[in-house]
Curated annotation (Swiss-Prot):
Family that this chain belongs to: Belongs to the xanthine dehydrogenase family.
Gene this protein is translated from: AOX4
Binding site for [2Fe-2S] cluster 2: 117, 120, 152, 154
Organism of provenance: Cavia porcellus (Guinea pig)
Keyword Oxidoreductase carried by entry: yes
Protein name as it appears in the record: Aldehyde oxidase 4
Length: 1341
């Protein structure tokens, strides 16, 4: 650190208020400062690496040179506060508040039902708000683009986009291809005509309620900041922190002086590279130099032979500049510009593009850079400057590959980049393939250019650059040199492919894995470029240069990024229902406005408690090992550290029900908690945790995969089995028998709010109070009491809301709560325990990976006579929920099909991975995708459509399941029939077949899936529930129940129930929190039964109260509610009541293999249509139609939101979400960079959901639980992908080829799709002997 005297004041504005920081610390981010110093907790912490958008805020700056104010979104977790000098920051609190005025953006997000858990909502609001500040009348495409950097795990995005589209000047034209009237009107008529002719509705909200947007009412930019920006006497600023110094030069000479003095100091502009490297790679820099807003770095000149762009331009500004240039210049001059523009649309999200600069992007020379390969191919030059002078260097292969002779010298900076215009016979392209279309780093990207001799196809110059193939961007310079002078023809292409494979060869165990896929992508992307040039030549001279075959043109078309639209259809409320009765209405989430304003408080939003400490974890780095020693000396010596907590500090049990709180003597997985560090700040705790030294001695065996567990007979629980008929005998009397296996990998919950606990010890009676987000407060209470060795009545758990859960907060908060409580007990001080995203993913695990093996006997007609199934799940190292999950897998394994001879066996494997746990669908989504795989295989062998085989084998009449529970499948048949009809399945299937005949390199797939989903659990006492209702003397009602609000709208529905039962408006009813103090012994909120059981308890309590009030009401029937309550009090009538529901009487006898395991079933059907790019492995979901048996929906908006969100989450499970483990059991996917949940661009372009009405007498108001059912319907997407891939394989192999059983797996990632679409390029790829190398990652299913 330089020896400097004092620190300058940092001045910026937040929400119109001036902030002056006397001693700003360069290591403090804007997110931390907003939340901890300014107590603006609406801006959320979710990933810490700029990948999720939950911390989005708007930054505004005034440019003295252009005299303009620029508003742009940023991720506050990456913004150092020292970079904000002279800037204005707007957070969600500055946009609007329920205490003052809710902004139209916030209002519409809430009223369009765009919030569920609400954790991502402030970020969504800020992204749309910033867009409107720049474009008050945005296009739908701009709305979609603005949301591309924001992740949501709950809603499925559709309602969020819809809320943004309400601001568009020209509403999107209806694209549901129906003749005549608006699709909504026709859909309404058609829906009403089905079966019951009930009146169906399509409006989930009333847009006439929206307040108008008035841009003139937005806050003005602070005049003081304009004066600061225009100050002619600016000087260098110095900000001195605890460990680092921030230097902000005022002029270019000053910058060069600092660069010469501190040549190793990073230049900070957007901090999108340096920030994550500091946090995740442990880098440390004593000095930062930040040349923001220097005019010399912001030049833009498009005159002459090219474009000069200052290095200080953000990528968003670069995009704007290039769009302007492309619109003004002839197309042949803008080949490079258009290639860059194309990549800029999907590079990261809008927030990162607004922060990252061109200079930083060029100078870092990252292998995953999307722009550098294109810049290199376009012969870009870099203008460098230092104290010694100026020079220009080519941005070429030598520069990108890190050659010392071709890079920046000490003291130099990138001043600008010169992008030359292209010529008529020059062609430049940028190509990429990532795990998902937007906001994902490329697996492989490329920049390619060719300059042909004028008027010919002779190569004068060829440039090919690849990213993602090595540690740097690589140039195929040798191959390109050999091809100069050759003709641009098929022979040249073949030589180029062979040359590139020889020149750029990845080792088989290369970092990142996917070696064969990456090799294939090199050739596929080259082929796309080859075709593009061929077509361009044909357009220049059709006589001289023949066009490419028509069926090849699809290779040139990239999947468009459209704006999703669709319909939501549900049964209208009975017109005779009292107007104030809210049941059946699409009521807004009771906390929706608070979500949108950031005023809904989550655990980490709670104010700091006096003497509070922060907890950081030390986790095992070995999968199975003895702990030899734990050295805490260096950690304890660090400033701010109060204690290191180990197993020795646990007062009670350290191992409860097989779950270990702190590792003791040995570790059984990578990620197991060994110890924790408590310190005065999280930064100090985290630093100290990194200093704890743990010595291990490995233990064999180390079991990571299911296959390894089977080899060692390593299981967590006994086998479960159900069987009907005579399976072995039936196999002898069928036309054909096929066998296969399907691997289904796991899934990360990726709830937006990571596991968070605030544990507060009380001074007397050994009490402990915990605030946390959980689905099971009783379980937390049990584990904490056990760990502290106190009765449960000393432990109070408070749960107001969780920022998403999906099963991940059923058991894991109990273990983590015990860990935090032990720390609070040892230190005697409150403990705040917030897991970072990477630690959360590592420690808490997720959905069980599954291996399914099937044997199916069937007739030539497609009728299945016998099925024998074996399922194995990877349970991890401790029991957790694995036994219950495998029981669900077995019980649900038939899905919607009647197989007369059916056997299913299942077992949970014990491995050295973190214990997998409950996840939405609870085993059903993994197991039944295996069922659909064998349905598809049977169809292939019978030359039938899979849908024909599904319908043939579906339950058709009142029946009993394989475990002897009776049910009526009539709603299943109705959902199937309606979906078949209203999705126009057969017409679209014929259209897809026509498309596939005319398109070689893109294939269209269509699939329709039925579903019979179970609700609840086979254990009766898990269905009991209780509620507590107080009526106060002013007539207001306080409602409490045992269910947890996770975003699923449970509290909203409970208020609707109470409103109906008490006959009062919901505005009279308040629901605060779930607590073990008010409702004891509550069961978990899971299994889609939250409304079923808690609704019954609330109903019971309200009916008890109304029975007490009846004498008062009878005497004054026309009186008001308040009068009745006052009179009841005067008559000493109790105005408080508990409600209780004993539960559904379910049971399952595993010895007899029979039982009434579930209270009822939910039925549904979904149809999905996808396009697949056979060359890259990308896919595009074109349309999804969902028909869900909702019986009577208490709240159609909530239920449709649950269905859409579950469908998109299921789609993620089956496509983009891929967990990767090292062979030694280390999770490699630990953040937004490595794990890709769907974004707004992945959801269907057309998204139609219909709630089908039926009856369900066992549940409250004849409703059904719909929280999980939609998850499996996402499998319609993977089935459609299988259909498209099968079409590609059939075309390659020939129409007369023998039917095959496609070796399917889940997820169907770009890698699987591409390698399954075998062609001449996959045939060229060398295959390495697996026994000769250690792979970078492995499948654990």
């Amino acid at each position: 650190m330089p020896s400097l005297s004092g620190s300058d004041e940092l001045i910026f504005f937040v929400n119109g208020k001036k902030v002056v920081v006397k001693k700003p610390d360069p290591e403090v981010t804007l997110l931390f400062y907003l939340r901890r110093e300014l107590h603006l907790t609406g801006t959320k912490f979710a990933c810490g690496e700029g990948g999720c958008g939950a911390c989005t805020v708007m930054v505004s700056r005034y440019s003295a040179s252009s005299k303009q104010i620029r508003h742009y979104p940023v991720t506050a977790c990456l913004v150092p506060i020292c970079s904000l000098h002279g800037a204005a920051v707007t957070t969600v609190e500055g946009v609007g508040s329920i205490r003052t005025r809710v902004h139209p953006v916030q209002e519409r997000l809430a009223k369009c039902h765009g919030t569920q858990c609400g954790f991502c909502s402030p970020g969504m609001v800020m992204s749309i708000y910033t867009l409107l500040r720049n474009h008050p009348d945005p296009t739908p495409e701009q709305v979609t683009e603005a949301l591309g950097g924001n992740l949501c795990r709950c809603t499925g995005y559709r309602p969020i986009v819809e809320s943004g589209k309400t601001f568009c000047a020209n509403p999107t034209v209806c694209q549901v291809k129906r003749p005549g009237r608006c699709c909504l009107e026709q859909e309404e008529e058609e829906a009403g005509s089905v079966h019951t002719r009930e009146k169906m509705c399509t409006k989930l909200y009333d847009k006439d309620e929206f307040q108008p947007l008035d841009p003139s009412q937005e806050p003005i930019f602070p005049p003081e900041l304009i004066r600061m920006a225009e100050d002619p006497n600016k000087r260098r600023l110095t900000f001195q922190g605890e460990r680092t110094t921030w230097l902000a030069p005022a002029t270019l000479p000053d910058l060069l002086e600092l660069r010469a003095e501190f040549p190793q100091a990073p230049l900070i502009m957007g901090n999108t590279t340096v920030g994550p490297d500091i946090k995740f790679k442990g880098e440390f820099h004593p000095v930062f130099v930040s040349p923001l807003e220097l005019p010399e770095l912001c030049v833009l000149n498009s005159e002459g032979d090219g474009v000069t762009v200052g290095s200080g331009h953000s990528l968003a500004q670069l995009s704007d500049a290039l769009q302007s240039i492309v619109s003004q210049q002839p197309s042949e001059r803008t080949e490079t510009c258009r290639a860059l523009l194309n990549h800029l649309r999907t590079l990261a999200g809008v927030q990162i593009r607004s922060m990252a600069t061109l200079g930083g992007h060029v100078a870092t020379r990252a292998t995953v850079s999307d722009l550098n390969p294109i810049l290199a191919a376009g012969k870009t030059t870099i203008h460098l400057v230092s104290k010694e002078g100026e020079r220009q260097i080519p941005l070429d292969g030598a520069f990108l590959e890190g050659s010392p002779r071709a890079g920046l010298r000490p003291g130099e900076i990138v001043l600008s980049v010169f992008i030359p215009y292209s010529s008529q016979w020059q062609f430049v392209s940028g190509l990429r393939q990532a795990q998902r279309q937007e906001n994902a780093m490329a697996i492989v990207n490329a920049g390619m250019s060719v300059r042909l001799e004028d008027g010919s196809s002779t190569i004068r110059d060829l440039q090919v650059f690849y990213g993602g193939i090595g540690p740097t961007v690589l140039s195929a310079s040798r191959t390109c040199g050999q091809l100069v002078g050759r003709q641009w023809d098929d022979q040249m292409l073949g030589e180029a492919c062979r040359g590139i494979l020889d020149e750029l060869r990845l080792p088989p165990g290369a970092k990142g894995g996917q070696v064969e896929f990456r090799h294939t992508l090199m050739l596929s992307l080259l082929f796309k470029f080859y075709l593009r040039v061929q077509r361009a030549l044909s357009k220049l001279d059709p006589q001289k240069f023949p066009d490419i075959p028509e069926e090849y043109t699809s290779a040139l078309e990239e999947f468009p990024i459209g704006t999703p639209q669709g319909t939501q259809i549900f049964r209208c409320v009975d017109p005779h229902q009292p107007p104030q009765d809210p049941v059946g209405h699409p009521v807004m989430h009771q906390a929706g406005l608070k979500h949108a304003t950031g005023e809904a408080a989550f655990v980490d939003d709670l104010p700091l408690v006096s003497q509070e400490l922060f907890l950081a974890v030390v986790t095992s780095t070995r999968a199975h090992a003895k702990i030899i020693s734990i050295d805490t000396g260096e950690a304890l010596a660090l400033p701010g550290v109060v204690a290191v907590i180990t197993a020795e500090d646990v007062p009670g049990e350290n191992n409860h029900q097989g779950e270990i709180f702190y590792a003791q003597r040995e570790v059984v997985c990578v990620g197991q908690i060994v110890c924790t560090v408590a310190a005065d700040t999280y930064a100090h705790a985290r630093e100290a945790a990194q200093k704890v030294k743990v010595e291990y001695e490995d233990i064999e065996p180390r079991i990571i995969t299911i296959e390894q567990a089977l080899e060692h007979s390593s299981f967590l629980s006994p086998e479960r089995k159900i069987e009907q008929g005579n399976v072995e005998q039936a196999f002898k009397h069928v036309d054909q028998v096929i066998e296969g296996e399907v691997h289904v990998e796991g899934q990360e919950h990726f709830y937006m709010e990571t596991q968070t606990i605030l544990a507060v010890p009380r001074a007397e009676d050994k009490e402990m109070v915990l605030h946390l987000g959980t689905q099971f407060p009783t379980h937390v209470q049990e584990f904490v009491a056990t760990a502290l060795n106190v009765p449960r009545n000393r432990i109070a758990c408070h749960m107001r809301r969780a920022g998403g859960a999906f099963g991940g907060k059923v058991t894991k908060p109990a273990l983590l709560g015990a860990v935090a409580a032990v720390a609070a007990k040892k230190t005697g001080r409150p403990i705040r325990f917030v897991l970072e995203r990477g630690d959360d993913m590592l420690i808490t695990a997720g959905r069980h990976p599954l291996l399914g093996r099937y044997k199916v006997g069937f007739m030539k007609s497609g009728l299945i006579k016998a099925v024998d199934l074996e399922f194995y799940i990877n349970g991890g190292c401790t029991p957790d929920e694995s036994q219950l999950v495998i029981e669900y897998v077995v019980l649900k394994s038939e899905n919607a099909y009647y197989i007369p001879n059916f056997r299913c066996r299942g077992r949970a494997c014990k491995t050295n991975l973190p214990s997998n746990t409950a996840f939405r669908g609870f085993g059903f989504p993994q197991a039944t995708v295996v069922v659909e795989a064998y349905m598809t295989a049977v169809a292939s062998h019978c030359d039938l459509l899979p849908e024909e085989v599904r319908e043939m084998n579906m339950y058709k009449r009142p029946s009993q399941t394989a475990y002897r529970q009776r049910f009526d499948p009539e709603p299943l048949r109705r959902c199937w029939k309606d979906c078949l009809e209203h999705s126009s399945f057969h017409a679209r299937k014929r259209a897809a077949e026509d498309f596939n005949r005319q398109s070689r390199w893109k294939k269209r797939g269509l699939a329709m899936i039925p579903m019979k989903y179970t609700i609840g659990v086979p254990v009766a006492y898990y269905h009991q529930a209780a509620a507590l209702v107080h009526i106060y003397l002013d007539g207001s009602v306080l409602l409490t129940h045992g269910g947890c609000e996770l975003g699923q709208g449970l509290h909203t529905k409970m208020m609707q129930v109470a409103s109906r039962e008490l006959g009062i408006p919901t505005s009279y009813i308040h629901l605060s929190e779930t607590s073990t103090v008010t409702v004891p012994n509550a069961v978990f909120t899971a299994g889609s039964m939250g409304t079923d059981i808690n609704g019954k308890a609330v109903q019971n309590a309200c009916q008890t109260l109304m029975a007490r009030l009846q004498p008062v009401i009878r005497r004054n029937p026309k009186g008001k509610w308040e009068e009745w309550i006052k009179k009841a009090f005067e008559e000493s009538i109790s105005l408080s009541a508990t409600g209780y529901f004993r539960g559904f009487q379910t049971n399952m006898d595993w010895d007899k293999e029979r039982g009434d395991a579930f209270p009822y079933y939910v039925y549904g059907a979904a149809c999905a249509e996808v396009d697949v790019d056979c060359l890259s492995g990308a896919h595009k979901l074109l349309r999804a139609d969902i028909f869900m048996d909702a019986a009577f929906s208490i709240n159609p908006a909530v239920d449709i939101g649950q269905i859409e969100g579950a469908f998109v989450q299921g789609m993620g499970l089956y496509t983009t979400e891929e967990l990767k483990y090292s062979p030694k059991g280390k999770l490699r996917s630990q953040g937004t960079n490595d794990y890709k949940i769907p974004t707004v661009t992945e959801i269907p372009e057309e998204f139609h959901v219909t709630l089908v009405h039926s009856r369900n007498p066992v549940a409250i108001y004849s409703s059904k639980g719909l929280g999980e059912a939609g998850m499996f319907l996402g499998s319609s997407v993977i089935s459609a992908i299988w259909d498209a891939v099968a079409a590609a394989r059939k075309e390659r192999k020939g129409a007369e080829s023998v039917p095959e059983t496609l070796a399917v797996r889940s997820p169907a990632t770009p890698e699987w799709i591409r390698m399954a679409c075998v062609d001449q390029f996959t045939d060229m790829i060398p295959r390495d002997d697996p026994s000769t190398f250690t792979p970078w990652s492995i499948c654990v299913s």
